[in-house]
Regions:
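Short conserved AdoMet
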Residues: 6, 127, 153-154
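A mobile, often basic/glycine-rich helix-loop segment
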Residues: 17, 156, 175-176
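Walker B catalytic acidic pair
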Residues: 137, 163-164
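Conserved P-loop NTPase-based nucleic-acid remodeling module centered on helicase motor cores
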Residues: 1-69
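Accessory N-terminal region flanking or inserted into the helicase ATPase core
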Residues: 50-134, 143-148, 171, 178
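Loop/turn-to-beta-strand initiation segments
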Residues: 131-132, 156-160
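Conserved coupling/interface region of RecA-like P-loop/ASCE motor cores
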Residues: 26, 167-174, 178-212
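Short glycine-/polar-rich loops that comprise or flank the Walker A/P-loop
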Residues: 8-11, 155-157, 186-191
Length: 212
């Protein structure tokens, strides 16, 4: 039988950004020489923070700043950015931010989407490397994280997504509103609903909310 140690050697536990950083450490050089450096050594910032960094303010044009902000707004409004928008955004980060050792949180995922789209051999590797994908708190997935997941899912991938729409607390940063229903339809998954809530069984007010 598999021991916990043996199983641990075969399991990767991470989040969306952690997965992307691991991929960029291996393949980031495909889109930028600057990414030959460990991505964890860059200063990670939000898109709206870029213009507040004095060193970046000197190199970012008004148009650059607008592109960064529009991408952030698109993601927060759960609108999947086009391939052209991703390319324009990524080029600004590559040309203007990376040389000064800055990277945006969104770029960490958008760089990986670009790599998986442009280098099918990398995509095939990750699809075969992860035959089973389990995502907890799936209801908090935003549009670019969803695009990332779809990129590494193949016809043979086994999927288990755990989540509760009632606990969707990241709508303000772009968590997709109907992601639980979407994934059931898109991948013909079986929805399993828990009929009993043991966490709040002694709290009548929470049980009332759960039933509604």
């Amino acid at each position: 039988p598999n021991s916990p140690v043996a199983i641990g050697d075969k399991v990767t536990i991470t989040n969306y950004h952690g997965f992307c950083k691991g991929l960029l450490k291996k393949y980031g050089y495909l889109i930028s020489d600057s990414l030959k450096k460990d991505v964890n050594l860059f200063h990670a910032i939000g898109d709206h923070d870029a213009e507040r960094q004095w060193i970046l303010k000197a190199v970012l044009s008004t148009t650059d700043i607008q592109v960064l902000k529009e991408m952030d707004a698109s993601i927060k409004e759960a609108r999947v950015p086009s391939g052209e928008a991703i390319q324009a955004y990524n080029q600004i980060v590559i040309q203007k931010l990376l040389p000064h050792e800055y990277i945006t949180h969104n770029a960490v995922i958008l760089f990986v989407l670009d790599i998986l789209a442009r280098f099918p051999e990398v995509k095939k590797f990750y699809q075969s490397y992860y035959p089973l994908i389990v995502v907890d708190e799936f209801q908090d997935t935003n549009c670019i994280a969803w695009e990332l997941l779809k990129s590494i899912i193949s016809d043979q991938t086994q999927l288990l997504f755990l989540g509760d729409p009632l606990q969707r607390i990241y709508g303000f940063i772009g968590a997709l509103p109907n992601i639980m229903s979407t994934v059931v339809d898109e991948y013909q998954m079986t929805k399993i609903s828990l009929s009993k809530n043991y966490r709040f069984r002694n709290n009548p007010e929470m049980l009332k909310l759960d039933r509604n």
